[in-house]
From Swiss-Prot:
Location within or outside the cell: Secreted
Keyword Secreted belongs to the record: yes
Swiss-Prot/TrEMBL GO biological process terms: neuropeptide signaling pathway
Domain of life, per lineage: Eukaryota
Name of this chain's protein: Extended FMRFamide-9
Described function: FMRFamides and FMRFamide-like peptides are neuropeptides.
GO CC aspect terms: extracellular region
UniProt entry keywords in alphabetical sequence: Amidation, Neuropeptide, Secreted
Residues with PTM Leucine amide: 11
Chief place where the protein resides: secreted
Entry similarity comment: Belongs to the FARP (FMRF amide related peptide) family.
Length: 11
């Protein structure tokens, strides 16, 4: 997803 470090788990 988008947001970077906040949602990197959703690559």
């Amino acid at each position: 997803g988008h947001g970077g470090a906040s949602n990197y788990v959703r690559l």
